[in-house]
């Protein structure tokens, strides 16, 4: 993570040179570094998880011990290895490695084999090591385990991938899946919180507490809280296997160290030696322990082990002390390795809790980015893998017990290898997690949610694809909250989260995106040398005594470890020295270290201290360090204590410490593609961030190798004439999303009201915004037959009259063939019976067969049973299709206007689009007006203008700049021209604003949404028309439609007709006397009578037939009456 290398060579301005370069389209020697950076957090976190992290996770799994035939058996996982994806052993093939393109095409999972070395021992004596296959786990594309790792673009193309393939996703059943980055509490940092809900946890509880999200090196996480009680004591709260436990703090402190009560008392009151209330509270906490007869550490451990062992599932031969040690290792400050460190951390948390309760320190905001980090894909993968490895050990014990019940099992290697195969397979749990995004865990992994962890990385267009890897979600549980505090954009997020790139609907403020310069720390470094460096700089070790009183010293914490104390006069100098070492790469201080000095203010503010963070999963961003003249990575917490300038004129000597690399560094990658976004109203930029991801563009270059369910393609994309410099930085011309259009702002017809727009029919005929949709269908004949039967293969019976030369000899359609509704689609044969089956094309939309891929099974031994047919559906713009500019100005195509009736300029130029001028005043999208002038001047002068935000100001006006360029080309300074009516040929009196604007066609098309039905299928139960466009269902007549008819006074006829006659009208027989719908039954006539002519109903309750009448009622009412009768509820009707 080099903070200085990435942003040094930003393009000074956009250019069209690369489009005219003869080498354009030839693969580079190396991939574009800027694009690879976008997925680096995903890829590098996974690399750490499957290499260093996997080794640490295996070491952290305790040996699994149990009793078997009066012997103590223990299993220990010594090592685990994940291998790159390969074909199964025994497969005959040239290439052993499996590549992602094959898994996409065959709709299978890109996965590697997980093997582990299991050591087994009897009564503590090692008996050997068994190498065991545990299952398959998904492999992230472009990670070190992927077969595409470090391949140059030419080699990637040869393996049917994009030249700029970025990776960062998994392939599950042929679908690309991304593990979503979630907001998590900052690890190993005590956060003071006030929550009224905590009062309900028990008698005497208050709303004050200190919470800590403890995370180990292998990312195992546990949440822990300290609660303040009304009597001044403190209760420790932790979670074990999703169960909440409470422990008085005194017991925890006494169990961790063998200190005397006086030493514990002295540690807890540091800095507040004269506070009588604190002294009494600490004395009371220690007195509670003494009252239980626990005066020594051993007695406390024995007491806690006896209380908790029933929940810990430890072996019976463990003494109570060992059970208590197991509890503290798994639940209390798990990020700390020694009990002494845990003791000092709990003391610090207690002091902070008392400061919060007494109003000496303010609460930390858990919704602020200062107290947050992100959950990376590698972190979730490693936590889940560790839990499943522990679960596998437990399943071996269960398999032992089952085997022992049936036969006499002896302990030897051969028997163990057989029993190991009976353990749980890790393949299905991983595939379930990635396929559904739902977490099945016994511990919860320290997460706040168990659903929505994975999303599909759909390639609707390249912008949408990029956004998946920069998205950060607050969490699914927060979406249900009624409060808006979690959605607010706080000042602390400046430079880390984009202020405009968030949805405008339900997930607004919950689904955010990282800025273009923001990075996620993924590397883990050992910090063993830093404590010694701190002591050399003047920090007093934790077991020493500072020269001044503790009230005038700051506590010093390094990654959640209490290192010592530092004099408040020395602290600023030490923080500056550490910052120098960090920027200059000296003293082995990592460049992503966060140095935070929270000063004493004498007022209720943040709890003071010197905090150092080097842990992964934090957000950092580069800024210019003005003192050293170099770039520095700063974190979210240290930023709030800095003075960061944006422009040069904002720098004040002695006050300003840092400066932004460029003004638009606060925007996300997608928001940086909006031209002149600083001239638009903020909501319009938000809309464009969303609509840019819905654009029908050019998402990839390997259409012939893809088997996605649906892909969009714009046939005639263009490079924008006006674009920000970041557009070129990310080489977006390789994946264009729109077309340069000549737009005239004029009310010319009545068809352009309410954001509608007129398109020149001649432009449409020349290919304006033409597109296609690629749909793929995966056909597997093995799903159509019974288990074990393999007699079905694709093919056709010669001379079959149903096919009529529509299909090839292999039973599949010809590539390039046009398909219509009812045409033969494919044919297959039963080899046993010789029977032929023909399936027909069922879609109402005509298509062209674009591609057919023949697939096989994992071993390559499958018969001709599986194909993937890709169809191309032409989708040229039609009335009702949606378009938008890059400024959130969306509208639908309302009319294709003949070119001879369109207005034209003096030079004979006819605009492509007529835009209603009423769309500007309320939307205030001045950026679109500037883009129109800039695009016009760019076309006239053969230039490509820079539309990067914040380059123009009131002093340096964009209107002046582009107006002068238009003037130099002989056009009006303000971008207006005289137009002539295409109908009358007369000159229009008003000056019309006309220019070039880059327009996008969105994926919302009438062809996908229109629905028409007269009569059709009905629901079997309610007899009402079924809903759904795919099944030719009815159109929903909802509450708004009902209210509209009521308001028009047509309830008697139209409303009755819609909701009754056209829905589920039925004629029912009712007894007028008893009012029952269920009692009238049809009497069976004598055999000699006609059953149709002599239909006679009789009331079974009244035993009369002259009281039967017919009424028209909804059929669903009859069903409702029958349901109530089943519940012993009678419905009586008054028939008038």
Curated annotation (Swiss-Prot):
Where, in this chain's numbering, is DNA template strand bound? 1036
Which keywords does this chain's UniProt record carry?
Answer: Chromosome, DNA-directed RNA polymerase, Metal-binding, Nucleotidyltransferase, Nucleus, Phosphoprotein, Transcription, Transferase, Zinc, Zinc-finger
**Modification type Phosphoserine: residues:** 1051
The record lists Zn(2+) as bound by: 1071, 1074, 1099, 1102
Q: What EC number(s) is this enzyme filed under?
A: 2.7.7.6
Looking at the record, which segments are called Fork loop 2?
474-489
Question: Matching InterPro entries, A to Z?
Answer: DNA-dir_RNA_pol_su2, DNA-dir_RNAP_su2_dom, DNA-dir_RNAP_su2_hyb_sf, RNA_pol_bsu_CS, RNA_pol_bsu_protrusion, RNA_pol_Rpb2_2, RNA_pol_Rpb2_2_sf, RNA_pol_Rpb2_3
Residue ranges of region Loop B?
A: 194-208
Tell me the segments the record calls region Fork loop 1. Answer: 439-453
Subunit and interaction comment? Component of the RNA polymerase I (Pol I) complex consisting of 13 subunits: a ten-subunit catalytic core composed of POLR1A/RPA1, POLR1B/RPA2, POLR1C/RPAC1, POLR1D/RPAC2, POLR1H/RPA12, POLR2E/RPABC1, POLR2F/RPABC2, POLR2H/RPABC3, POLR2K/RPABC4 and POLR2L/RPABC5; a mobile stalk subunit POLR1F/RPA43 protruding from the core and additional subunits homologous to general transcription factors POLR1E/RPA49 and POLR1G/RPA34. Part of Pol I pre-initiation complex (PIC), in which Pol I core assembles with RRN3 and promoter-bound UTBF and SL1/TIF-IB complex.
Q: Report the protein name in the record.
A: DNA-directed RNA polymerase I subunit RPA2
Which organism encodes this protein?
Pongo abelii (Sumatran orangutan)
């Amino acid at each position: 993570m080099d903070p200085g290398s990435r942003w040094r060579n930003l393009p000074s301005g956009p250019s069209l040179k690369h489009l005219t370069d003869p080498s354009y389209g030839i693969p580079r020697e190396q991939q574009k570094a800027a694009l690879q950076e976008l997925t680096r957090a995903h890829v590098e976190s996974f690399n750490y998880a499957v290499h260093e992290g996997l080794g640490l996770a295996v070491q952290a799994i305790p040996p699994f011990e149990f009793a078997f035939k009066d012997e103590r058996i223990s299993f220990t996982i010594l090592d685990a290895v994940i291998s790159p994806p390969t074909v199964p052993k025994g497969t005959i093939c040239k290439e052993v490695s499996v590549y992602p393109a094959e898994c996409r095409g065959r709709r299978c999972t890109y996965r590697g084999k997980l093997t582990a070395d299991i050591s087994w021992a009897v009564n503590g004596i090692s008996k050997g090591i068994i190498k065991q296959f545990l299952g398959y786990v998904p492999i992230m594309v472009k990670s070190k385990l992927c077969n595409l790792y470090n391949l140059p673009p030419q080699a990637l193309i040869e393996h049917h991938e994009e030249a700029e393939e970025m990776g960062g996703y998994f392939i599950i059943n042929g679908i690309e899946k991304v593990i979503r980055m979630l907001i998590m509490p900052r690890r190993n940092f005590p956060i003071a919180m006030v929550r009224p809900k905590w009062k309900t946890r028990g008698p005497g509880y208050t709303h004050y507490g200190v919470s800590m999200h403890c995370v180990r090196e292998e990312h195992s996480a546990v949440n822990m809280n300290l609660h303040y009680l009304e009597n001044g004591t403190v209760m420790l709260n932790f979670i074990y296997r999703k169960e909440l436990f409470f422990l008085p703090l005194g017991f925890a402190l006494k169990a961790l160290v063998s200190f005397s009560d006086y030493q514990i008392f002295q540690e807890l009151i540091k800095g507040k030696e004269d506070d009588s209330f604190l002294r009494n509270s600490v004395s009371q906490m220690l007195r509670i322990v003494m009252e239980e007869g626990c005066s020594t550490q051993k007695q406390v451990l024995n007491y806690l082990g006896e209380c908790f062992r029933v929940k810990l599932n430890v072996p019976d031969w463990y003494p109570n002390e060992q059970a208590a040690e197991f509890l503290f290792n798994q639940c209390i400050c798990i990020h700390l390795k020694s009990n002494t460190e845990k003791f000092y951390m709990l003391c610090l948390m207690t002091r902070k809790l008392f400061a919060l309760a007494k109003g000496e320190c303010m609460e930390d905001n858990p919704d602020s980015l200062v107290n947050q980090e992100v959950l990376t894909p590698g972190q979730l993968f490693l936590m889940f893998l560790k839990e499943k490895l522990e679960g596998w050990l437990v399943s071996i014990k269960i398999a032992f017990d089952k085997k022992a019940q049936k036969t006499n099992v002896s302990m030897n290697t051969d028997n163990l290898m057989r029993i190991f195969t009976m353990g749980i397979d890790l393949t299905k749990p991983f595939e379930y997690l990635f396929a559904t995004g739902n977490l099945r865990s016994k511990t919860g992994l320290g997460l706040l949610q168990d659903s929505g962890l994975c999303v599909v990385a759909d390639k609707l267009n390249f912008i949408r694809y990029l956004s998946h890897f920069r998205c950060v979600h607050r969490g699914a549980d927060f979406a249900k909250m009624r409060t808006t505090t979690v959605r607010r954009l706080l000042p602390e997020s400046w430079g880390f989260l984009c202020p405009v790139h968030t949805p405008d609907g339900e997930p607004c403020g919950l689904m955010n995106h990282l800025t273009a310069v923001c990075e996620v720390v993924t590397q883990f470094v050992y910090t063993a040398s830093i404590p010694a460096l701190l002591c050399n700089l003047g920090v007093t070790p934790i077991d020493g005594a500072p020269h001044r009183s503790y009230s005038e010293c700051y506590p010093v914490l390094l990654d959640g470890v209490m290192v010592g104390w530092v004099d408040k006069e020395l602290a600023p100098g030490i923080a500056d020295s550490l910052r120098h070492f960090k920027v200059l790469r000296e003293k082995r201080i990592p460049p992503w270290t966060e140095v935070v000095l929270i000063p004493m203010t004498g007022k209720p503010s943040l709890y003071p201290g010197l905090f150092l963070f080097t842990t992964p999963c934090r957000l950092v961003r580069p800024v210019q360090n003005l003192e050293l003249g170099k770039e520095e990575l700063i974190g979210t917490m240290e930023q709030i204590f800095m003075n960061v300038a944006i422009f040069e004129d904002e720098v004040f000597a002695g006050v300003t410490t840092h400066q932004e690399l460029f003004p638009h560094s606060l925007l996300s990658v997608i928001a940086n593609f909006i031209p002149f976004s600083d001239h638009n109203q903020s909501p319009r930029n938000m809309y464009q961030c969303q609509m840019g991801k819905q654009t029908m563009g050019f998402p990839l270059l390997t259409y012939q190798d893809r088997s996605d369910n649906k892909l969009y393609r714009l046939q005639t994309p263009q490079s924008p004439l006006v674009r920000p410099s970041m557009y070129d930085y990310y080489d977006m011309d390789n994946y264009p999303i729109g077309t340069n259009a000549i737009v005239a702002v004029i009310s010319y017809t009545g068809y352009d009201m309410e954001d509608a727009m007129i398109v020149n029919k001649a432009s449409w005929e020349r290919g304006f915004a033409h597109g296609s949709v690629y749909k793929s269908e995966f056909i597997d004949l093995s799903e159509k037959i019974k288990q074990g039967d393999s007699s079905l293969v694709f093919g056709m019976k010669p001379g079959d009259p149903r096919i009529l030369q529509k299909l090839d000899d292999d039973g599949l359609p010809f590539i390039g063939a046009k398909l219509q509704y009812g045409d033969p689609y494919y044919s297959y044969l039963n080899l046993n019976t010789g029977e032929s089956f023909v399936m027909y094309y069922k879609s109402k939309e005509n298509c062209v067969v674009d591609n057919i891929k023949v697939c096989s099974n994992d071993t390559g031994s499958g018969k001709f049973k599986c194909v993937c047919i890709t169809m191309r559906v032409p989708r040229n713009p039609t009335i009702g299709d949606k378009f938008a500019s890059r400024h959130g100005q969306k509208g639908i195509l309302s009319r294709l206007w003949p070119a001879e009736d369109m207005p034209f300029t003096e030079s004979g130029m006819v605009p492509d689009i007529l835009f209603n001028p009423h769309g500007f005043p309320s939307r205030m999208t001045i950026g679109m007006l500037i883009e129109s002038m800039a695009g016009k001047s760019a076309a006239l002068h053969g230039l490509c203008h820079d539309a990067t935000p914040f380059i123009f100001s009131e002093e340096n006006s964009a209107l002046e700049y582009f107006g002068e360029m238009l003037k130099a080309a002989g056009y009006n300074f303000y971008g207006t021209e005289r137009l002539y009516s295409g109908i009358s040929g007369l000159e229009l009196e008003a000056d019309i604003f006309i220019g070039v604007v880059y327009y996008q066609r969105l994926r919302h098309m009438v062809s996908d949404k229109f629905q028409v039905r007269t009569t059709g299928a009905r629901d079997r139960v309610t007899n009402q028309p079924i809903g759904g466009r795919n099944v030719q269902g009815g159109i929903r007549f909802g509450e708004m439609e009902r209210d509209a008819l009521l308001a028009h006074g047509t309830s008697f006829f139209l409303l009755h007709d819609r909701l009754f006659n056209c829905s589920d009208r039925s004629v029912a027989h009712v007894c007028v006397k008893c009012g029952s719908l269920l009692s009238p039954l049809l009497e069976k006539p004598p055999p000699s009578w006609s059953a149709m002519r002599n239909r006679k109903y009789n009331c079974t309750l009244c035993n009369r037939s002259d009281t039967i009448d017919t009424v028209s009622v909804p059929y669903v009412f009859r069903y409702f009456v029958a349901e109530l009768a089943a519940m012993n509820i009678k419905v009586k009707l008054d028939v008038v």
